[in-house]
């Protein structure tokens, strides 16, 4: 397959609004990314082994964090180990896999300036830091010790923003502020070019900047203003593409929420069940919290949530294109042309 065709596939499958090559050949770029993914996973397995996990559990939890899938071999998830060391290692591991993998390549190539000027990275780390500190303060009365509060807050923030879904405690029992922040983090997601789901940090930053740009244009109609990322003006087409994605995302969310409400469950459970699925988190709140599950949903609702999970993971558009008649007409025309 040519590099041109491969690039089109990359743009379709890449989590986030942008995709690019690290080196001249796409095949070499893929090897670099897969190599970093493999090495980081092995490092995490080794660190978990040092914490007392056996090889099977360490491998399961490392792969669950690496792919931000969140699968655990224990019913109580990572909380079953009741280990501060394992919590910290897993939390940092999840956070690392939520970062754009291109930045790790830049670090290896000593391109520190490219890493330092990444607005998405600083926004990501800033959101994590703010959320961790404020949630820790909000739940301090539940755990007493500052260190314990920070540990649980950091782990859950890292788990939710990277869309991994691991848990050390039943955060459904936390105060309202802490739960609200976690729900908001479900929508933010990881960085573009990471294994995380959600909207992606770069899209959120772009949407906020575009909103301020539009407000400035309303105040100063003749002013020439652009959305700037990392010191460069973003093409108008790219900004509108992010806004279009967000609009389709919210439309799918609204339709799915309306249909799920027919199950008759409480608002919180329905809302967070959909949020957890479309953003690929796993646990939500209420009946689908860390100690709950989705078994009470009707079969058709489970199919809908399954579709939302796939749509969210594939960046929505590829899934929705399946229902556009012209997609199939175009394929039939190309097959007819090849036969003739």
Regions found by a protein language model. Give the residues of each.
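Membrane-proximal intracellular helices of multi-pass ion channels
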Residues: 1-340
